[in-house]
């Protein structure tokens, strides 16, 4: 009897304990944060489809299509059941699993009205989770300290970069003005040098043409001299042959045709002819040409080579003309005709006597023509002399012009003193002062250009341009850097100049925040995208528009951030084709608000154990 009583007491105690652990029926399956929604007398369906009274809550009849009225039963297919799982992690299951004979909740709350008794295993199952949570809380505590330090450094660095950018922009403006001035002066120098070059080319061309002309004249004179020498040699031979022939013909004529009439005719003719010759030759002897030359003139070159049949006077006149420069072409021709007439006298005596009276007149005409041609030649040589003198005068004048080409500035001394920058001046002040000194010193109107001064201007221009280029490059880098969003507290500022790598199998993945992400295999690199933006409140980094997959989309990468004491990239995967994911641990995600939430969760799980034990 006593034994039965003891067993009955044990059963009653177990039943009471089970009833105590099970939540009230009206709140069964409702999350703690939603309990206030079900406190009213009339409750609205969450989808707005209708209303139901509080006494119909969990009555095992579905009044709302979305299962709002049956969170603790399996009456509604769309209903959800909340497992509190005290001492472990709470979960939500479909209402269809309630009282199905399978323990889905570690606290057994889902099988409250079934033939199965579920043991509460939440504390044992949650031990590993609690240990993990404790470690996570400790990591967050250390990470928050590191994050705060990094934020302070980032703010200082960001402000420093902003100040540097502002300073560089000011220096760029000043330096740009100096470069513009030097550019303008450099153009003036180049213009002056170009003018000087053209002047020299023109002068060299003129001198070359004069040299070529002089060489041509000398060659022409040389050819003419050779031709005259050859002509003289030929004429000398002909003259000797003519003398011999004349002597022979004279004897033959005297022997065959000697008559008194012819003798008297010849005697009358010779004195008169001689007198006429002396009369006409006298003016030429009294006024010889101003300039004589051993070299024959052009008119002498054109003298007929055939001198046969000339008299001694004619031959003498021919020889004399070579030394005096007198023209004897027409005289020789007239004398030759006269000589032939004399030879014809025996056959035509009457005509000869009639012609004798005309001989002096003919001689006068001939000599008059000779005299006129000599005068013409004289004037011709005078003109040639004048032409040579004009050329000489032109050369002298031109040389004088070239010698006086320098401007008056060549005679002036450089009274500008050299500038020495103060040791306390900055590099920009030194450049400004040096450029101003150069611009004051250099004379841009001097011709020819002073090469040393021109080189100095060019050197200052090159130096200033080089510094300006470096400043502009730095400005571009800082501007591109500062335009990015580095988080609410600049916590990601130090990510800009860093890259994080992870080796997964045969690939090496490289992520460079704010720039690009890539997949490296040996010497081959595949782009996984360029920087796009932050997502989910700075918890995800998005890289887009990478290399296109074969018959697929462009590659992309999402990097999920989590709290960690070091910056480490891991967990790279490709869940969908050409869409990659990765995890990056960093102190930047260890924020204080999240730390407080974790501490409360850990405390709640510990308090639940104490409550259960009680």
Swiss-Prot record:
Keywords assigned by UniProt, alphabetized? Disulfide bond, Endoplasmic reticulum, Glycoprotein, Plant defense, Signal
Gene3D superfamilies annotated for this entry? Mannose-6-phosphate receptor binding domain
Report the locations given in the UniProt record.
Answer: Endoplasmic reticulum
Q: Which GO terms describe its cellular component?
A: glucosidase II complex
Name the pathway it acts in: Glycan metabolism; N-glycan metabolism
> What job does the chain carry out?
Regulatory subunit of glucosidase II. May be required for defense response elicited by pathogen-associated molecular patterns (PAMPs).
Q: How does it assemble?
A: Heterodimer of a catalytic alpha subunit and a beta subunit.
Q: What is this protein called in UniProt? A: Glucosidase 2 subunit beta
The organism is Oryza sativa subsp. japonica
């Amino acid at each position: 009897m006593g034994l039965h009583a003891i067993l009955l007491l044990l059963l009653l105690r177990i039943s009471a304990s089970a009833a105590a652990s099970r939540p009230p029926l009206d709140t069964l399956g409702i999350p703690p944060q939603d309990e206030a929604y079900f406190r009213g007398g009339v409750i609205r369906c969450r989808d707005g489809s209708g209303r139901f009274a509080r006494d119909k809550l969990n009555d095992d009849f579905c009044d709302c299509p979305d299962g709002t009225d049956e969170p603790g039963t399996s009456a509604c297919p769309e209903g959800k059941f909340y497992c509190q799982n005290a001492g472990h992690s709470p979960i939500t299951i479909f209402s269809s699993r309630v009282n199905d004979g399978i323990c889905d909740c570690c606290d057994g709350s889902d099988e409250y009205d079934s033939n199965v008794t579920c043991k509460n295993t939440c504390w044992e199952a949650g031990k590993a989770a609690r240990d993990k949570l404790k470690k996570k809380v400790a990591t967050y505590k250390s990470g928050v300290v590191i994050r705060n330090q990094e934020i302070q450094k980032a703010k200082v660095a960001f402000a420093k970069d902003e100040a540097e950018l502002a300073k560089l922009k000011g220096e760029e403006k000043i330096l740009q003005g100096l470069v513009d001035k030097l550019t303008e002066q450099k153009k003036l120098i180049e213009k002056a040098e170009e003018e000087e070059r053209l002047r020299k080319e023109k002068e060299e061309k003129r001198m070359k043409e004069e040299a070529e002309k002089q060489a041509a004249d000398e060659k022409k004179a040389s050819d003419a001299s050779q031709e005259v020498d050859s002509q003289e040699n030929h004429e000398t031979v002909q003259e000797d042959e003519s003398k011999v022939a004349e002597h022979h013909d004279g004897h033959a004529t005297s022997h065959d045709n000697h008559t008194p009439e012819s003798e008297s005719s010849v005697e009358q003719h010779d004195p008169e002819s001689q007198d006429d010759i002396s009369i006409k030759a006298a003016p030429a002897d009294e006024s010889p040409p101003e300039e004589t030359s051993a070299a024959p003139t052009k008119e002498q070159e054109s003298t007929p080579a055939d001198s046969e049949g000339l008299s001694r006077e004619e031959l003498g006149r021919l020889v004399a003309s070579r030394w005096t420069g007198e023209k004897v072409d027409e005289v020789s021709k007239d004398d030759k005709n006269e000589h032939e007439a004399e030879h014809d006298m025996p056959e035509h005596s009457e005509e000869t006597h009639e012609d004798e009276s005309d001989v002096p007149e003919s001689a006068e005409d001939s000599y008059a023509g000779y005299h006129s041609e000599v005068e013409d030649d004289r004037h011709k040589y005078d003109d040639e002399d004048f032409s040579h003198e004009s050329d000489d005068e032109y050369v002298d004048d031109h040389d004088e012009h070239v010698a006086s080409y320098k401007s008056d500035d060549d005679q002036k001394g450089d009274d500008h003193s050299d500038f020495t920058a103060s040791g306390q001046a900055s590099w920009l002040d030194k450049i400004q002062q040096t450029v101003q000194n150069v611009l004051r010193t250099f004379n841009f109107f001097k011709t020819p250009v002073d090469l040393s001064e021109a080189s100095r201007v060019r050197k200052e221009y090159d130096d200033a341009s080089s510094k300006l280029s470096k400043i502009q490059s730095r400005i571009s880098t800082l501007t591109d850097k500062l335009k990015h969003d580095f988080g609410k507290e600049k916590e990601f500022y130090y990510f800009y100049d860093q890259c994080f790598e992870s080796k997964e199998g045969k690939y090496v993945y490289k992520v460079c925040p704010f720039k690009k992400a890539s997949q490296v295999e040996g010497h081959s690199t595949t782009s996984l995208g360029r920087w796009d933006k932050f997502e989910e409140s700075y918890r995800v980094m998005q890289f887009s528009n990478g290399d296109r997959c074969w018959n697929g989309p462009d590659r992309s990468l999402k990097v999920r951030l989590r709290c960690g004491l070091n910056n480490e990239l891991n967990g790279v995967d490709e869940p969908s084709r050409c869409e990659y994911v990765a995890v990056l641990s960093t102190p930047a995600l260890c924020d204080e608000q999240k730390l407080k939430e974790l501490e409360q969760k850990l405390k709640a799980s510990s308090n639940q154990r104490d409550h259960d034990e009680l």
